[in-house]
């Protein structure tokens, strides 16, 4: 949250140069406060587990957040009861006319399936397009980040021979973005995917900014320059055992997955995983919610005219 200070206080310029969030008394006096309305499109198979992971991150901020859960309307969930889906999830038609402060679209376990071959690809495209007019800021995670970069910017991913799974070291490529406030010079994040975006193409795109990257795992956080879309190539929401559960699931299915890198103590799957990404995962979501949702969204959600308009690749 911002520190409120008197107008024209000399310290303001110094604090802002150090990336400390300050707000003048005048601005604070004119700022209305209400709950943030966040929509979650949950594409992961275990809906309840993913809900819990994301709500844990959203709840770790001083903001009140009202959450709606969204599902793909014509796709039944194999791992979550129909009662749960009907009781807690909405179809797109139920929210199409609404506006939201934030939207989170999760990853999806689609392996090496091409985007155009995904059975619900047209619906994903429809929701992404809708979000650019009805949502202040969108957070895309893992598969959703790749899908949105492809749909919005025409940037396709490259498939990997071996799944990139593990916990990798990352570094900031800039220190001047509010999203990175509080980030260490080196931090860790989990990845679990069969594809990768070309980091040089991301860097070269005039509408994108690569904020953090990994020598082993490539681009991690990419922001559209209108601040409306944040693409995160990994899984900051993952809990300590998630990569282990995925590894054991693949083995149970008769696959031969590689051991997740930098994850198990002594690279021994019988030992406890090492958790070292939760603080930065929490900080990422907190910074996004504060600086790119709360600080940018209109008080009256019925009027989105003040939000920077989206310009498509066409």
From Swiss-Prot:
Residues at the active site: 142, 235, 237
Marked site (Important for acyl-CoA specificity) residue numbers: 111
Keyword Acyltransferase applies: yes
Keywords: Acyltransferase, Amino-acid biosynthesis, Cytoplasm, Methionine biosynthesis, Transferase
Residue numbers binding substrate: 163, 192, 249
Database matches in Pfam families: HTS
Catalysed reactions listed for this entry: L-homoserine + succinyl-CoA = O-succinyl-L-homoserine + CoA
GO cellular component assignments: cytoplasm
Top-level EC class: transferase
GO molecular function, a single term: homoserine O-acetyltransferase activity
Site residues by UniProt (Important for substrate specificity): 192
UniProt GO BP: L-methionine biosynthetic process from homoserine via O-succinyl-L-homoserine and cystathionine
Cystine connections: none
EC number: 2.3.1.46
Keyword Signal: no
Family membership: Belongs to the MetA family.
PANTHER family membership: HOMOSERINE O-SUCCINYLTRANSFERASE
Protein role: Transfers a succinyl group from succinyl-CoA to L-homoserine, forming succinyl-L-homoserine.
Protein name, as recorded: Homoserine O-succinyltransferase
């Amino acid at each position: 949250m911002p520190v409120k200070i008197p107008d024209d206080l000399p310290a303001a310029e110094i604090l802002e140069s150090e990336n400390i969030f300050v707000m003048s008394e005048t601005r604070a006096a004119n700022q209305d406060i209400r709950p943030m309305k966040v929509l979650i499109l949950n594409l992961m198979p275990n809906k309840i587990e993913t809900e819990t992971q994301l709500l844990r991150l959203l709840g770790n901020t001083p903001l009140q957040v009202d959450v709606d859960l969204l599902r793909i309307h014509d796709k039944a969930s194999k791992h979550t009861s129909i009662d749960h889906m009907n009781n807690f999830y909405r179809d797109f038609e139920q929210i199409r006319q609404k506006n939201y402060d934030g939207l989170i679209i999760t990853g999806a376990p689609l392996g090496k399936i091409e985007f155009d071959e995904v059975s619900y690809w047209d619906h994903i495209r429809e929701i992404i397009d809708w979000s650019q007019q009805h949502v202040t800021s969108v957070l895309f995670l893992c598969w959703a980040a790749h899908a949105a970069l492809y749909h919005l910017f025409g940037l396709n991913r490259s498939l990997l021979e071996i799944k990139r799974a593990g916990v990798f070291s990352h570094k900031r490529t800039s220190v001047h973005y509010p999203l990175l406030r509080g980030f260490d010079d080196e931090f860790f994040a989990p990845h679990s995917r069969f594809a990768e975006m070309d980091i040089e193409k991301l860097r070269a795109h005039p509408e994108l900014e690569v904020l953090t990257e990994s020598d082993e795992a490539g681009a991690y956080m990419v922001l559209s320059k209108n601040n409306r879309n944040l693409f995160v190539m990994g899984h900051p929401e993952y809990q300590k055992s998630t990569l282990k559960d995925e590894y054991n699931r693949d083995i149970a299915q008769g696959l031969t997955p590689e051991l997740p890198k930098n994850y198990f103590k002594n690279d021994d799957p019988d030992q406890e995983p090492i958790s070292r990404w939760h603080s930065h995962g929490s900080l990422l979501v907190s910074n996004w919610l504060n600086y790119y949702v709360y600080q940018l969204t209109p008080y009256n959600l019925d009027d989105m005219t003040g939000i920077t308009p989206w310009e498509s690749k066409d």
